[in-house]
Design a protein with these regions (language model features):
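Conserved short acidic donor-positioning loop in nucleotide-sugar-dependent glycosyltransferases
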Residues: 12, 24, 39-44, 65
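Short, acidic, metal-binding catalytic loop of nucleotide-sugar glycosyltransferases
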Residues: 22-31
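Short beta-strand/loop segment that forms part of the nucleotide-sugar
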Residues: 31-40, 59-61
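Acidic helix N-cap motif at the loop->helix transition within catalytic regions
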Residues: 43-51, 95
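Glycine-rich, basic loop-to-helix element that forms the pyrophosphate-binding segment
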Residues: 61-78, 88, 99
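Short aromatic/hydrophobic "clamp" motif used to bind/position activated sugar donors
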Residues: 83
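Conserved donor NDP-sugar-binding/catalytic core segment of glycosyltransferases
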Residues: 91-134
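A recurrent flexible, glycine/aromatic-enriched loop bordering the glycosyltransferase active site
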Residues: 126, 138-139, 146-170
Length: 172
């Protein structure tokens, strides 16, 4: 059995899939299985994956139930001890899975480890480097809009952005 499940929720995201899956195909760490959870898409998403990435496990829902239900279904159907949640509009570095897996394995008490997300529109800016909450209970993305060169070392955060993070199955 692989060590990591990569769960990707989707709704009519065909236009993003070539970039996302091409990057996953180049990973330095290969002990992972990809679960693609489709929320009743009307585009060519599933057909594209069947043709170009047949090793991907496709879970087709009959309607658009949203992010939470989709990722929960992917988690339920996967069995690997670690789960990466990954948005379909991401392009990951070659060591993405490896670094997240190593990061969570080094921190035995960690529930999750988050990747630093770089803005899709402004590639020199951070979109999210972990999440915090203010005194009123409002969540905010750490580092949003800062230069991509910041937040280069591991640090404790309150929560991980579920768009690119790894979780221990035992805590899910």
């Amino acid at each position: 059995m692989d060590k990591v499940a990569v769960v990707i929720p989707n709704y009519n995201g065909y236009r993003y899939l070539e970039t996302c899956f091409a990057a996953l195909a180049k990973q330095t760490f290969t002990e992972f299985t990809t679960y693609f959870v489709d929320n009743g898409s009307q585009d060519e998403s599933c057909a594209f994956l069947r043709e170009h990435y047949p090793e991907t496990k496709i879970i087709q829902l009959d309607d658009n139930y949203g992010f939470s239900r989709a990722v929960n279904e992917g988690i339920r159907q996967s069995k690997e001890p670690y789960v990466i949640l990954l948005n379909n509009d991401t392009e990951v570095f070659q060591d993405f899975v490896e670094r997240l897996y190593e990061g969570i394995c080094k921190r035995k008490n960690a529930f999750a480890c988050s990747a630093k997300l770089i803005s899709y529109q402004e590639r020199d800016k951070i979109d999210d480097a972990g999440n915090y909450y203010n005194m009123l209970g409002w969540a905010f993305a750490r580092g949003k809009g800062k230069p991509v060169s910041e937040f280069e070392t591991s640090d404790r955060i309150f929560a991980a952005c579920a768009g690119a993070a790894i979780y221990r199955r035992e805590f899910l």
